Design a protein with these regions (language model features):
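Active-site-proximal structural scaffolding
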Residues: 64, 126-130, 136-138, 145-148, ...
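Short loop/turn segments at secondary-structure transitions that flank enzyme active sites
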Residues: 77, 81, 143, 151, ...
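Active-site proximal loops enriched in glycine and acidic residues that flank catalytic Cys/His/Asp
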Residues: 122-126, 147-149, 156-158, 198-200, ...
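Hydrophobic residues embedded in beta-strands of well-ordered beta-sheets
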Residues: 150-153, 298-300
Length: 311
């Protein structure tokens, strides 16, 4: 039938083969796709992963496997993403800009070369809940989504400076006189080995498993294995880094502290890095408040009497 068909938003491929060459077997085809053209920052070169100058907040269309801009596309596209519910002004593009730069940084690939820290090479074939898709993207970038009251922003686990300091002088003092209460993670939750599932392009794009271990922790605590899926991962080095991040996080971040603050706590969003000076923990007095300043006599009035060291 000579009819012109229309296939909107579809990459269509037609192949004609002789069925006698395959006998009774069904012909299967695999394609290596680059994927979608995304909106990326106007000062960004996706080929070299370089950022030039200061970004003015505008975008340009380009192919990119940067995880941050793949997430931006999913959140703002009106056809298959959340664009009908979230506008461009509702998503913190400036936070994604910093996250995208962190993902593009070159790191050792484990085989003598370098590669971007995090890339996204995934395809979504089924309709899923928006939160599940958002969680997959954020887990790969080691970040979490946060609604700060105005926009959907993102907080990433990466090296950063502290934003505030807390001590006994700026927290709520309970009746027992211990403002900081500590707790620890269970030993069973501190995994020292992880099996990371990822897609191996050198093995027909089949699922492979990368085993990551901390031998010193295994010798000390015994073997404690968990499993994880590396979303959008087609690099063995990236899979290894994902497993190593999980192990180090669970082995090193074992302590949590609970305390109450006043109105100044409203300055924070989840994921902020803070510093705590606990007198009971340190065994010394570590902080206080200035009650008054007299510029004429050049004197300070403190909240308690202190003894200055002789030196």
């Amino acid at each position: 039938i000579d009819v012109k068909q229309c296939y909107p938003n579809t990459a269509l491929v037609g192949v004609q083969v002789d069925s006698e060459q395959f006998g009774s077997q069904q012909v299967s085809r695999n394609y290596h796709l680059r994927g979608r053209i995304l909106q990326v920052p106007s000062n960004y070169n996706p080929q070299t992963r370089q950022y030039s100058g200061i970004w003015d907040g505008t975008f340009k269309p380009a192919y990119s496997n940067n995880m941050a801009w793949c997430l931006w596309d999913m959140l703002t596209h009106p056809r298959y993403g959340m664009g009908k519910r979230l506008g461009a002004a509702d998503v913190d593009k400036w936070a994604l800009y910093v996250i995208g730069q962190y993902c593009d940084q070159s790191v050792p690939d484990g085989f003598g070369g370098t590669e971007p820290r995090i890339t996204c090479n995934a395809y979504l074939t089924t309709q899923r809940k928006a939160w599940d898709v958002l969680s997959d993207f954020c887990s790969a970038m080691r970040c979490m989504p946060v609604w700060n009251g105005q926009t959907l922003t993102f907080v990433q686990d990466r090296p950063s400076d502290k934003v505030w300091t807390y001590n006994r002088s700026n927290v709520v003092m309970p009746d027992d006189g211990a403002p900081f209460r500590y707790s620890f993670s269970a030993l069973k939750d501190r995994h020292n080995a992880v099996e990371v599932n990822w897609i191996d392009p050198n093995n027909g794009w089949e699922t492979a498993t990368e085993l990551v271990e901390d031998t010193q922790a295994i010798a000390r605590y015994g073997r404690n294995v968990t499993k994880m899926d590396a979303f959008g991962c087609t690099s063995r080095g990236q899979a290894h880094r994902a497993g190593l991040w999980l192990i180090k996080t669970e082995l090193l971040e074992t302590q949590t502290v609970d305390f109450s603050v006043g109105a100044e706590g409203l300055r924070h969003v989840p994921g902020d890095v803070i510093e705590i000076f606990d007198d009971d923990y340190a065994g010394i007095s570590t902080g206080g408040r200035v009650l008054a300043v007299n510029s004429q006599t050049r004197t300070l009035t403190l909240d308690r009497e202190i003894t200055l060291p002789s030196s």
